Regions:
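C-terminal capping alpha-helices of c-type cytochrome domains
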Residues: 129-169, 242-270
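Bacterial signal peptide processing site
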Residues: 21-24
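Post-signal peptide N-terminal segment of mature Sec-exported envelope proteins
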Residues: 28-54
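Bacterial N-terminal signal peptides
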Residues: 10-18
């Protein structure tokens, strides 16, 4: 493994990327024009101000920056430009400054034409990233426009001054850009596949911001294209820079986002049952495992762009079976016995795989949503009945409902809508999506998180056709989470609320709302014992370069219970998953959605005995993104996915297996098609993380 070298983090300094941002390959290298002699600051004249305003609008600068006096310039990706000129002198004198400018004019010019020469330390309270702003910005500005922008930033209008010109906050619907039928159909499909998970099917926002026309029209095609191409430091992928989309495709998406979102159809029970297939009936399945392999150490691996999962032998690293599943599988959950793997695709197709067969085989499937993220099974076995392997539940993004199914055949039994009212403003929400679901050991209950309205539902499945539901008030934008080490308390991130909600599954009540850094994204989290604070549960973040650890021991360490007791800094934000094991001395974390490609493929480990900073970080690959960790059943190995590009032979993806004790690489499982999540049978059944 290569040693990690310090990677400068921060944000772009200057303006948003202009029209040339996504055409880097088409334009010659930018050279910095000589800075003119600095003139005394004076009020911006109307013609110069109008020219600057036109330049800001031309480039969609307000998509990334707050710019005083510029209508709708309220972006938060880049730094606030309100006082950039006033702070230039102090910055240039700082030892951290890496540029060459000696005057304010030269500083602003450098920031526009050579944005990575110096990366500012702060972007609206978050660490910012190198490489977000393209140097090809200068190609889109004439010398007159550049001079006007510099003059404007040196003397922007005050709070009480009128803006130079006005425009409506949102353009009328009939002013939205046009799309051909072919373009509209393509953009609609791509939005569902790549964007709806964070921004919502109706584009009302969740993990990502709302993309309704009242928001997007103000940014315009160029501003939207800038963000789509470059991504953001808060977790949005850089679709253009990665090569997922061409400039022409990005332009189509930007125009699509300024139109009203198309209304998706509902999915009634009749249509669900029409999609239901049982390929091997329960009485035709084996009574005992037919394989000599250690099936409890199988890994079920998502092959995202192949529409498959690979079942890999954790002892031999062999691919035992590739099984067709739904599109872009989000998660796999095991039945309570571990025999069956329930695989949910983002297209709402649920596949059931029998791991006892000599070759793991799909035995049933059904589609209960058009967009989904979660599946869980019934696990309770106690005084109120034995529900082992009897039921399953799928949580849908669209339509907003969950569906209870027969756990042996996947026959749909009952549908429950999640439409309702938000916990904070009590406003009706038409699209409250179902996020994570976990199964309680204390009751025949599922804990179902209803994202947009901020409610946690305790769903009693003892009577699956008439489930009893207790609604707990938490915080909006609930997403993913997991159990504490005792499996009594469930912790779930309300990511855009910057909180973690805590539920006591034994008593069926809310315990706490814990404030965290920006946009917590724990996956299932990581349970470990902090040397100072005792048992904790930890999460990474999309919006901040940090790990938060929350005390989880109200009996042994009551002073620290349900408080954020430690924040461990990371080299970058964009973390999706964190993982540990009771037998390990390490905590592993990724930065998958960081806009810096080096950080996106970098993984870090934190020593439990010294959790104040990363023990070491390294690049796991020379391409793609490092994502998601999973231990083998013994807790001696860690598997990490290299999420590649299905269109690039040799770089489609692989899994890297590390020795957990020494952090040394053991083996690579190559030539997998965009592997992402991995689910070890034993660890998934027993909720070990």
């Amino acid at each position: 493994m290569r040693p990690w070298k310090h990677i400068v983090t921060g944000a772009m300094l200057g303006l948003a990327v202009l029209i040339g941002c996504a055409r880097q390959a088409e334009t010659p290298p930018t050279t910095t024009a000589p800075a003119p002699q600095e003139a005394p600051v004076s009020a911006t004249t109307a013609p110069a101000g109008d020219l600057a305003l036109a330049a800001f609008k031309k480039g969609g600068c307000g998509a990334c920056h707050i710019i005083p006096g510029v209508p709708n310039a309220r972006g938060t990706i880049g730094p606030d430009l309100t006082n950039i000129a006033q702070g230039a002198a102090q910055t240039m004198q700082s030892s951290a400054y890496t540029g060459k400018a000696t005057t304010v004019d030269a500083y602003l010019r450098e920031a526009i034409l050579e944005p990575d020469v110096f990366v500012a330390p702060d972007c609206n309270g978050s660490s910012c990233q190198k490489g977000i702003m393209s140097p090809s910005l200068g190609q889109g500005l004439s010398e007159e426009e550049l001079a006007a922008v510099i003059t404007y930033l040196k003397n922007p209008p005050g709070e009480t001054e009128a803006v130079i010109s006005e425009e409506p906050a949102a353009a009328p619907a009939d002013a939205a850009p046009t799309l051909s039928d072919e373009e509209f159909a393509w953009a609609k499909l791509v939005y569902f596949e790549r964007c709806a998970g964070c921004h919502g099917t109706l584009r009302k926002g969740a993990t990502g911001p709302a993309l309704t026309p009242d928001k997007t029209m103000a940014l315009g095609t160029v501003g939207l294209s800038t963000i789509i191409y470059n991504g953001t430091p808060r977790g949005m992928p850089d679709w253009g820079k990665q090569g997922f989309f061409t400039q022409e495709q990005i332009d189509v998406l930007a125009r699509f986002l300024q139109r009203e979102p198309p209304a998706p159809p509902e999915l009634p029970m009749e249509r669900m049952k029409a999609s239901w297939n049982v390929y091997v009936a329960p009485d035709q399945r084996p009574d005992t495992p037919q394989t000599t392999r250690n099936w409890q150490n199988y890994f079920v691996v998502t092959l995202r762009d192949a529409g498959q999962v690979a079942v890999i032998d954790g002892d031999t690293y062999e691919v035992v079976s590739n099984v067709d599943s739904g599109y872009a599988v989000h998660i796999t959950r095991m039945s309570a016995t571990g025999r069956y793997a329930y695989v949910i695709g983002r297209d709402g197709k649920l596949a059931m795989i029998d791991l006892w067969m000599e070759t793991p085989t799909k035995v049933a499937e059904v589609q209960v949503c058009y967009d989904a993220r979660s599946v869980e099974v019934s696990k309770y076995n106690g005084p109120k009945g034995d529900f082992t392997d009897k039921l399953a539940v799928v949580g849908c993004y669209w339509p907003p409902h969950f569906v209870i199914l027969d756990g042996q055949t996947l026959e749909p039994i009952h549908i429950v809508s999640t439409r309702g009212y938000t916990v904070d403003t009590m406003e009706y929400h038409p699209e409250p999506r179902v996020a994570s679901i976990v199964a309680s050991d204390f009751q025949p209950e599922w804990i179902i998180n209803v994202k947009e309205i901020g409610q946690i539902w305790l769903v009693n499945y003892a009577d699956p056709k008439a489930p009893q539901i207790k609604m707990l008030q938490a915080a909006r934008f609930l997403h993913d989470g997991g159990w504490d080490a005792t499996h009594r308390y469930f912790l779930v991130a309300a990511n855009q609320s910057n909180k973690v909600a805590v539920v006591d599954a034994q008593e069926g009540r809310m315990v706490a709302l814990v404030h965290t850094p920006k946009i917590p994204h724990p996956g299932r989290g990581a349970n470990w014992v902090d040397p100072e604070f005792g048992p904790v549960w930890s999460s990474g973040h999309l919006g901040d370069p940090a790990i938060v650890s929350i005390g989880t021991d109200p009996e042994g360490h009551p002073d620290y219970a349900w408080k954020a007791v430690r924040v461990t800094p990371l080299p970058g934000a964009g973390s999706l998953f964190i993982k540990t094991h009771p037998n390990s001395k390490w905590i592993w974390i990724d930065m998958t959605l960081n806009s810096d490609p080096v950080l996106a493929r970098t993984i870090c480990v934190i020593a439990k005995e010294n959790p104040t900073e990363p023990h070491t970080c390294w690049e796991a690959s020379t391409y793609g993104r490092a994502v998601h960790f999973e231990y083998n059943a013994a807790g001696t190995e860690v598997w990490v996915s290299i999420w590649g590009d299905a269109s690039k032979p040799g770089e489609t993806g692989e899994i890297v297996v590390y020795d957990d004790a020494t952090l040394t690489e053991k083996v690579r499982i190559p030539n997998l098609v965009t592997p992402t999540g991995k689910f070890n049978v034993y660890n998934t059944v027993h909720d070990i993380y």
